[in-house]
């Protein structure tokens, strides 16, 4: 991903129909108030903490300074899958 893509923002948005690990990743960032991992890294200037065994996001710091903690297992329930936005660059 180039620096130009990061500065301009996403080119497309779609809504997923089925759960996947990419949907889980997006769901966790969006619960904390971020668009995706790219926006989080740009704002916080660091990578998020992840669970070592599966790579899921463990802890995120919201824009107001509070922390959001996530389980080791799936957090995005089937009813929330279509509420998640998948951004394309």
UniProtKB/Swiss-Prot annotation:
Family: Belongs to the MEIG1 family.
UniProt xrefs under PANTHER family: MEIOSIS EXPRESSED GENE 1 PROTEIN HOMOLOG (PTHR17008:SF1), MEIOSIS-EXPRESSED GENE 1 PROTEIN (PTHR17008)
Protein name (record): Meiosis expressed gene 1 protein homolog
Lineage: Eukaryota, Metazoa, Cnidaria, Anthozoa, Hexacorallia
InterPro entries assigned: Meiosis-expressed_gene_1 (IPR020186)
Any one cellular-component term (Gene Ontology): nucleus
Pfam families xrefs: Meiosis_expr (PF15163)
Taxonomic source organism: Nematostella vectensis
């Amino acid at each position: 991903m180039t620096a130009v893509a990061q500065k301009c923002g996403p080119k497309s948005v779609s809504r997923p129909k089925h759960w996947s690990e990419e949907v889980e990743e997006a769901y966790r960032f969006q619960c904390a108030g971020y668009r995706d991992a790219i926006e989080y890294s740009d704002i916080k200037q660091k990578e998020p903490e992840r669970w070592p065994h599966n790579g899921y996001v463990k802890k995120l710091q919201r824009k107001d300074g509070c922390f959001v903690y996530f389980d080791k297992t799936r957090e995005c329930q089937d009813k929330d899958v279509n509420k998640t936005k998948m951004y394309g660059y």
